[in-house]
């Protein structure tokens, strides 16, 4: 806990989110913008709110987020992971419900690198028999 803020770091793909939560009326600010302005897609907004709705804390916390790297989906996943960790920092009894829903575990999938002699990570050059 930092002052009266609870903190959690979230990661997904190449995105990293630093999440601060404190008691409030449900305002979520991402990189200085309201969440609806920052995340254009409804699915991204839904992903971010999942841990709050699961624990019935959607309107009880003000959340401040700094997120860098990645794209929209990766950043939304990183924010969700960070909110989950901040909620656990606030109340450790929430951990079992959040882990059962799969929000505590970091999604370790990363982009596979392109290999030399291939078009993409696994796509080989076309083989010609003759």
Swiss-Prot record:
The gene is rpsI. Keywords: Ribonucleoprotein, Ribosomal protein. GO terms for molecular function: RNA binding; structural constituent of ribosome. NCBIfam families: PRK00132.1 (NF001099). This is Small ribosomal subunit protein uS9. Disulfide bonds: none annotated. Belongs to the universal ribosomal protein uS9 family. It comes from the Bacteria. GO terms for cellular component: cytosolic small ribosomal subunit. GO terms for biological process: translation.
């Amino acid at each position: 806990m930092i002052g009266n803020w609870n903190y959690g770091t979230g990661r997904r793909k190449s995105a990293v989110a630093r999440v601060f939560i404190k008691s409030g009326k449900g305002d979520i600010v991402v990189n200085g913008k309201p969440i609806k302005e920052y995340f254009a897609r409804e699915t991204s907004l839904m992903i971010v709110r999942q841990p709050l709705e699961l624990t019935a804390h959607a309107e009880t916390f003000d959340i401040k987020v700094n997120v860098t790297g990645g794209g929209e989906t990766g950043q939304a996943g990183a924010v969700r992971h960070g909110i989950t960790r901040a909620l656990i920092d606030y109340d450790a009894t929430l951990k079992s419900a959040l882990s059962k829903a799969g929000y505590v575990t970091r999604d370790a999938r990363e982009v596979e690198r392109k290999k030399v002699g291939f078009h993409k990570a696994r796509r080989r050059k076309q083989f010609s028999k003759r």
